[in-house]
Amino acid sequence: MAKGEGNVLAQHKKARHDYHIVETIEAGIVLTGTEIKSVRAARIQLKDGFAQIKNGEAWLVNVHIAPFEQGNIWNADPERTRKLLLKKREIQHLADELKGTGMTLVPLKVYLKDGFAKVLIGLAKGKHDYDKRESIKRREQDRDIRRVMKSVNRR
């Protein structure tokens, strides 16, 4: 867990498998009252989500926040686009990185920090199938090496 990161409410576990994460940035999320209650109850899914830059603002798209059960008429659309709170120079940096490079912004995790909901956004480049196979092969080799070293150290 990164420094200052509170309790993690949701993670996009497959993101590091599907993408090369180049850089991460912490951003706040603009939420309604019933949405923050659902987020605190960990009823959020990042699987299909992504972020985009439009008109100098950062937006979180396709992140599903389940309707709050006691929210009735105050519940917002679960799939609505939510504004991300970033500094202007951070948004400009991300916009420059995204221009024509095959990069995308992927939400990696949502957590609470000092009572506020934060999202860790990753600047990512998609992996090819052979990259994924290579990552799996490397992980299995590391696991085998650790297993052998553990058995050698026990003797």
Swiss-Prot record:
Keyword match Calcium: no
InterPro entries: SmpB (IPR023620), SsrA-bd_prot (IPR000037), SsrA-bd_prot_CS (IPR020081)
MF terms (GO), sorted A to Z: RNA binding
A Pfam family matched in the record: SmpB
GO cellular component: cytosol
PROSITE patterns assigned to the protein according to its UniProt record, in alphabetical order: SSRP (PS01317)
Main location: cytoplasm
Keywords: Cytoplasm, RNA-binding
Compartments, as annotated in UniProt: Cytoplasm
PANTHER family tied to this protein: SSRA-BINDING PROTEIN, TMRNA-BINDING COMPONENT OF TRANS-TRANSLATION TAGGING COMPLEX
Similarity-based family: Belongs to the SmpB family.
Cited NCBIfam families: PRK05422.1, smpB
Annotated protein name in UniProt: SsrA-binding protein
Organism expressing this protein natively: Streptococcus equi subsp. zooepidemicus (strain MGCS10565)
Gene giving rise to this polypeptide: smpB
